[in-house]
Amino acid sequence: MKKIEMYHHKKVLVLGLARSGVSAATIMHKLGAFVTVNDQKPFSENPEAQGLLEQGIKVICGSHPIELLDEGFELVIKNPGIPYNNPMIEKALKLKIPVITEVELAYQISEAPIVGITGTNGKTTTTTIIHHMLNTHKENSSLLAGNIGFPASAVAENATSDQYISMELSSFQLMGVETFKPHISVITNIYEAHLDYHTDRSEYVQAKWHIQKNQIADDFLVINWDQEELKNLTKQTKAQVIPFSTTQRLGQGSYVQNGNIMFNDEVIGERDNILLPGEHNLENVLASVAVAKTLGVTNEEIMHVLETFKGVEHRTQFVVEWQGRKFYNDSKATNILATQSALKGFKNPVVLLAGGLDRGNSFDELLPFFKNVKTLIVFGETADKIGRVGKIAGIEVHYVDNVEAAVPVAYRESAPGDIILLSPACASWDQYRTFEVRGNAYMDAIGELIEEVEK
């Protein structure tokens, strides 16, 4: 960790805890700042706050008292989930107190260069692929951080100059950066999202675009050339632009030509050898290849990762091939768009498992994507709604109680060569606490099925 002096004896307010807040407070304390932590959760139910108090950090829990800002703070580090229209943030900005997010602190203390990845879709998968490619090239050369579950500042604290930090970044995090500068920035794509947090689409796009705002001519920006909006924005960057495209033969950057993954006119390997299915994953692959080639990863090392990487858990994750059937876990598909993307990725017949929390959708938008679906197995609050669309498509529909009950039915109704896909198109909360719990239930049920059949 860089021993920076800029925060020594500064009064710093960390607003909102969770893992990133705990990490920011702890590091600021080590840097000699006078740290106060404020979190809405009551102290008695807040083990994180209790741990910080034991370190000698001032802790205020149970509410966000706006008068706290009258205590002369010189900096606010906010949890990325707290919006800028929060009264505490509005008052801090009115008082001209700088407001940053924890990734800004991570950059300031990091000895390791950062590969920053943002976008509406594909951030986690792309970040993970890049991480694996760099570590295949040189063991322990990449550390995983950011919105992926490891606080950026905690990772940066222990990173060394011969490593890279592969950092997933949300628009929430990027809105609060001032000096943050990745050596390589990646923007996978931009669609409508988080308009409950951002005032409008323009603010959302600008938050994503912040990832490159401090880059210079020695840095790189890997960007989706299939999106005209992003292509036009590259006129504003000082970084070296590396495009990627799933639809165009670019001749530079990464793209597909004659069934091959290409980079700057060089064949990296065959597209058909990639384990991850789908056009959306092809975007993630091409962005990752651009980063890997820029950092000296060999074609053999790149293809080793692409031929073996099963996907991030619960995101069109390949589970197992058994009895000629391939099982995929896409429990993260908590909306219709995500299930559409998953279905587009398969050419073989699909047995689809879908259903969950009813948010008032009709699911008619799934109809054009049911061309390869041979059987539909539905469960949860939306079983009847999704089943109705399946019947309109002329698909055989089976109604079951839950994901666990769906798995043996899917096996019975499938044949060798089929895809068995959990892609619910709904949130899990009607039956499962999280989409992870639902995905794990699916994978456990597959294991039990295999054990039962092979007895």
From Swiss-Prot:
Single GO molecular function: tetrahydrofolylpolyglutamate synthase activity
Record Pfam families: Mur_ligase_C (PF02875), Mur_ligase_M (PF08245), MurD-like_N (PF21799)
GO cellular component: cytoplasm
Predominant location category: cytoplasm
EC numbers for this chain: 6.3.2.9
One GO BP: cell division
Pathway noted in the entry: Cell wall biogenesis; peptidoglycan biosynthesis
Coiled coil: none
Domain of life: Bacteria
Catalytic activity: UDP-N-acetyl-alpha-D-muramoyl-L-alanine + D-glutamate + ATP = UDP-N-acetyl-alpha-D-muramoyl-L-alanyl-D-glutamate + ADP + phosphate + H(+)
Annotated binding of ATP, by residue: G119, T120, N121, G122, K123, T124, T125
NCBIfam families: murD
Function summary: Cell wall formation. Catalyzes the addition of glutamate to the nucleotide precursor UDP-N-acetylmuramoyl-L-alanine (UMA).
Classification via HAMAP family: MurD
Family: Belongs to the MurCDEF family.
Protein's name in the database: UDP-N-acetylmuramoylalanine--D-glutamate ligase
Species of provenance: Listeria monocytogenes serovar 1/2a (strain ATCC BAA-679 / EGD-e)
Name of the gene: murD
